[in-house]
Amino acid sequence: MKRIRIRFTFLLFNAVLFIFRDAGLIFEFYAVCLLHELGHLAALKLTGGELRMVELSGIGIRITASPAADIKRGAAVLLSGPAVNLLMYALLSFSGNSGRLAELSLAAGLFNLLPFSSLDGGALLDMLAEGSPHERLIQSVLKAVRIGIILILACFAVRCACISLCV
């Protein structure tokens, strides 16, 4: 049974987004998100998977599907969203349209490849580790990498905040 669930946080996120009132940015943001999710859905269809639910929340869109028949099919579905974003970036850049839409596409593609479980890259790493004789070790290493990324981003954010306050 296919269902669509819309969380309150999705509506709240949209309200905040519309405060910016830059219609172009809003359109480009949703175009990038839509293309990303269509990439997942196309791969799901091509690999014989079945869509079960789409959930919209303030932290993103989650697609729940039937379990992948094998790791290759699961990987194809997980990587197809970021691949569409990166392909869109390449096409726009090579055609001379390296503006905001291209930048948003690149950012979405790279962001979704980060090794966090709620993102495509992390879900792929978790899927590859599952059932491995070294699963606990792999998960521990991934946890350390995730903490490292958070610390680096936090330091970068603090540095940027200090620079903008000093200017």
Model regions and ranges:
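Hydrophobic transmembrane alpha-helices and their immediate loop junctions
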Residues: 1-167
